[in-house]
A protein has these predicted regions:
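OB-fold ssDNA-binding interfaces and closely related basic DNA-contact patches used
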Residues: 21-61, 94, 106-108, 117-140
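Compact, well-ordered interaction domains used in eukaryotic information-processing assemblies
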Residues: 70-76, 80-106, 110
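Heptad-repeat coiled-coil amphipathic alpha-helices that mediate oligomerization/assembly
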Residues: 2-23
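A cross-kingdom feature marking solvent-exposed beta-strand/loop segments within repeated
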Residues: 66-85, 174-188
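Short glycine-rich, low-complexity/disordered patches
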Residues: 98-127, 209-224
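Short, solvent-exposed interaction modules
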Residues: 116-185
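A short, structured beta-strand/loop element
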Residues: 51-74, 157-172
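Mixed-charge, glycine-accented linear interaction segment located at domain edges/termini
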Residues: 161-224
Length: 224
């Protein structure tokens, strides 16, 4: 192979390498942007955390992911996802920032009960019997109930409790949980008053930004 041809091959190899590096860089940027958008709030404890994600904004839902992990191995022990309608999430955020939920929590805490009752809870939800069967999630034919609530905490002002139980779909399609026994999954995430406010602000700002972007990009029904 003569010298000129070798130089040309080296030049082509260099160009291909530059293109490959560019593609990898763009993919990395794309991944970073996706992570930033999809995961917009997080509350952590020593062995649990709750993340709030925008993955399901396109279907009008906010995704709350709860995880419990082993502190030594840092591996996940239990996890569950709960979906909330956007408008319900906005109402939840407003109830926090307006002081309604903190006031209810203070009133409940003042009763002096060892285990204060929840002052707020998500609507009944989960996976119905048909989908459970299709996905092979249970062998008893029951639905899966998933919800979480917020109550006054012991060491922290507030604690989120996410629970999964067997359930049954009612005539309205809501999944009624069975309370005759311990939950199959239970994950608690305690938080401070400031963390709760930050969560509410993040929910509001991200949903409002998403909806504003829909209007800006004309991503709405124009047939009316």
């Amino acid at each position: 192979m003569d010298k000129e041809m070798q130089q040309q091959l080296n030049f082509i190899d260099k160009r291909l390498q530059n293109i490959e590096n560019y593609v990898k860089k763009q993919e990395s940027i794309k991944t970073q942007r996706k992570t930033l958008v999809n995961e917009f709030a997080e509350i952590n404890t020593l062995d649990t955390f709750m993340k709030v994600k925008a993955n399901t904004f396109n279907i009008g839902k906010v995704l709350f992911s709860f995880v419990k992990f082993d502190k030594k191995t840092m591996k996940s022990i239990e996890s569950m996802d709960v979906y909330m309608d956007m408008d319900d999430a906005l109402l939840f955020a407003n109830d926090i920032l307006s002081g309604r939920i903190p006031t209810l929590a203070a009133t409940e805490k003042a009763k002096g009960e060892k285990y204060p009752k929840a002052v707020w809870s998500t609507k009944l939800g989960g996976i119905n019997e048909k989908k459970v069967k299709e996905r092979g999630l249970r062998e008893d034919g029951k639905a899966i109930s998933r919800l979480f609530n917020l109550a006054p905490g012991a060491r922290q002002p507030f604690v989120f409790t996410a629970e999964q139980r067997p359930g049954k779909s009612d005539e309205k399609g809501l999944i009624q949980p069975e309370y005759n026994g311990r939950p199959e999954i239970q994950i608690r995430v305690a938080c401070s008053a400031d963390d709760l406010k930050k969560l509410a602000i993040s929910i509001q700002s991200n949903i409002n930004a998403y909806r504003a972007a829909q209007y800006a990009n004309k991503e709405f029904d124009t047939t009316w």
